[in-house]
């Protein structure tokens, strides 16, 4: 079973210019490491022109720390189709850089240990939040001359109960299979503006990106503190439009269980830096969790 790309040529290049773009993102790439202290990372999932550099900061840190055997990649289900908690069961995913194999044993073990997840490929058919991460992983695996597999999981329900269940299931599955795992939580932060039907504050055009950043950093601080309850609390308090808190919460729960002691914000930006539009501003962050 092959999952074909849904957004190649739109969110990211579908031709040879993809490699050129990745080379620019990673021109400061260091040596492939072996420490393996990173347990999880947070990345955005907008078009590469807006958030690709920010995403590359997370993957650069993981590469220099040492690539794992398996990336468990969690993203929000924007389409609404398929199972609410959908683990892609087996096969491979295709991108312009080739195929990347699904770790089917890990996928099935997570679904078995979870009380809420299903094995389901339909939820992934048109979803972009996981697909856009794969070229980064493929490019770096080629650099490291190593094989890396993935477990894609889409989340249509995102709350404290879900993240506690999934974080624990992923941790227990990794232990049961003796698998070296890094979680990738795919999320964009605030979606501000009339285009998103979300205008919680008014400000002069030149002040808006700073206000968006202020609101995002209230959430980001909770993430850096490993505070799942606090993160969801801030989101509810602000009616915040972060789209992937479930993946981030799962990454925090897993990282705590895996012995992570610190989290670091590597990069933050907004779409305004590229678009210069105040009709729609989206926040993007790169974060890693380390032992």
Swiss-Prot record:
Q: Which InterPro entries match?
A: MEMO1_fam
> Pfam families per the record?
Memo (PF01875)
Q: Which domain of life is it from?
A: Archaea
NCBIfam families with a match to the protein in the record? AmmeMemoSam_B, PRK00782.1
State the family named in the UniProt similarity comment for this chain. Belongs to the MEMO1 family.
Protein name (record): MEMO1 family protein TON_0132
Q: Which organism is it from?
A: Thermococcus onnurineus (strain NA1)
């Amino acid at each position: 079973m092959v999952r074909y790309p849904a957004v190649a040529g739109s969110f990211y290049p579908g031709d040879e210019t993809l490699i050129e773009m990745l080379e620019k993102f990673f021109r400061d790439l260091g040596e492939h490491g072996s420490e393996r202290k990173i347990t999880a990372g947070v990345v955005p999932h907008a078009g590469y022109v807006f958030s690709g550099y920010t995403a590359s900061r997370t993957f650069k840190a993981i590469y220099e720390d040492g690539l794992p055997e398996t990336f468990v990649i969690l993203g929000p289900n924007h389409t609404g189709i398929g199972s609410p908690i959908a683990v892609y069961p087996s096969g491979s995913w295709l991108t312009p850089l080739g195929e990347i194999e699904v770790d089917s044993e890990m996928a099935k073990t997570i679904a078995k240990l979870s009380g809420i997840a299903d094995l389901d490929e339909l939820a992934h058919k048109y979803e972009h939040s996981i697909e856009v991460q794969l070229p980064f992983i493929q490019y770096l695996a080629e650099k490291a001359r190593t094989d890396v597999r993935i477990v894609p999981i889409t989340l249509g329900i995102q709350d404290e109960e879900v993240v506690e269940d999934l974080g624990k299931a992923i941790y227990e599955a990794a232990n049961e299979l003796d698998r070296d795992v890094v979680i990738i939580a795919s999320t964009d932060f605030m979606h501000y503006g009339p285009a998103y039907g979300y205008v919680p504050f008014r400000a002069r055009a030149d002040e808006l990106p700073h206000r968006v950043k202020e609101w995002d950093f209230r959430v980001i601080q909770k993430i850096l503190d490993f505070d799942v309850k606090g993160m969801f609390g801030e989101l509810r308090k602000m009616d915040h439009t972060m789209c992937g808190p479930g993946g981030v919460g799962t990454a925090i729960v897993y990282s705590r269980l895996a012995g992570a002691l610190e989290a670091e914000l590597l990069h933050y930006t907004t779409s305004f830096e590229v678009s210069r539009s105040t009709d729609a501003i989206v926040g993007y962050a790169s974060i890693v969790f380390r032992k």
